[in-house]
């Protein structure tokens, strides 16, 4: 970690931290609320399926729109207008200044997330809603990809000194706290899908052995 003087940013925030958290939290809540409501009209069989569907909808939209905005708006940190999407990234860069400098590592990770993982996450939500045969395999694959991206994110920072935060608070709240969500949740979903796939394979093997007899 470092003091604020080592963070190479010269932008001006147009929203307070509290206001940004309030608006961002409201946006995320609405996405989850709408996703939960829609999931009740789908073939998602259990409450856990509905929770997972909400995750895929949420993470998919974040990848496509929020992270996509960062990737495809190179001058966002020069934007001095009250642009909510730009302000979100200005705020997050307090925890990881690599975003403000568009460091190659984070730009690469975010590019893959917005272009590849975003659409695949939304497809995973659709597959779960429609109970598609590729449902668990897709969820497992995307979760592993998210874990891989998260590992690259943390490891690249560690190898470069891990000193990109403006204060210990932003280091733990933003860099560690927020980013860890994409370690914990994908890991849990990957484990769940692995068990589901194994159970299906076991039943199929048992069925095949019964036929042979």
UniProtKB/Swiss-Prot annotation:
EC annotation from Swiss-Prot or TrEMBL: 5.3.3.-
Pathway(s) served: Secondary metabolite biosynthesis; terpenoid biosynthesis
Location of this chain's protein in the cell: Membrane
Membrane topology: Multi-pass membrane protein
GO biological process annotation, one example: sterol biosynthetic process
Reaction equation(s) it catalyzes: 7,8-epoxymelianol = isomeliandiol
Top EC class, one word: isomerase
Domain EXPERA: 48-190
Tissue occurrence: Mainly expressed in petioles.
Spans through the membrane: 18-38, 52-72, 109-129, 137-157, 171-191
GO cellular component: endoplasmic reticulum; membrane
Keyword Lipid biosynthesis set for record: yes
GO molecular function ontology, one term from the record: cholestenol delta-isomerase activity
KW Membrane (keyword) present: yes
Keyword line: Isomerase, Lipid biosynthesis, Lipid metabolism, Membrane, Steroid biosynthesis, Steroid metabolism, Sterol biosynthesis, Sterol metabolism, Transmembrane, Transmembrane helix
Superkingdom as given in the UniProt entry: Eukaryota
InterPro entries, alphabetized: EBP, EXPERA
Family note: Belongs to the EBP family.
Function: Isomerase involved in the biosynthesis of limonoids triterpene natural products such as azadirachtin, an antifeedant widely used as bioinsecticide, and possessing many medicinal applications including anti-tumoral, anti-malarial, anti-rheumatic, antibacterial, anti-inflammatory, anti-pyretic and diuretic effects. Catalyzes the conversion of 7,8-epoxymelianol to isomeliandiol via skeletal rearrangements.
Protein name (record): Isomeliandiol synthase MOI2
Provenance organism: Melia azedarach
Gene assigned in the entry: MOI2
């Amino acid at each position: 970690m470092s003091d604020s003087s080592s963070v190479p940013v010269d932008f001006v925030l147009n929203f307070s931290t509290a206001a940004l958290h309030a608006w961002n939290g409201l946006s995320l809540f609405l996405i989850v609320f709408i996703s939960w409501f829609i999931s009740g009209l789908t073939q998602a069989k259990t409450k856990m399926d509905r929770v997972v569907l909400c995750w895929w909808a949420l993470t998919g939209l974040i990848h496509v729109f929020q992270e996509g905005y960062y990737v495809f708006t190179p001058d966002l940190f020069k934007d001095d207008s009250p642009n909510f999407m730009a302000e979100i990234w200005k705020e997050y860069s307090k925890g990881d200044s690599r975003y403000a400098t568009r460091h190659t590592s984070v730009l690469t990770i975010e590019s893959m997330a917005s272009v590849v993982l975003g659409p695949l996450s939304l497809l995973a939500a659709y597959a779960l809603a429609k109970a598609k045969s590729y449902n668990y395999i897709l969820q497992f694959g995307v979760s592993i990809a998210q874990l891989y991206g998260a590992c690259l994110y943390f490891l690249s920072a560690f190898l470069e000194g891990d000193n990109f935060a403006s204060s210990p608070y932003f280091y733990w709240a933003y860099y560690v706290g927020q980013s860890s969500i994409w370690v914990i949740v994908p890991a849990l979903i990957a484990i769940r899908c692995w068990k589901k796939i194994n159970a299906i394979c076991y039943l199929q093997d048992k069925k095949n052995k019964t036929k042979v007899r």
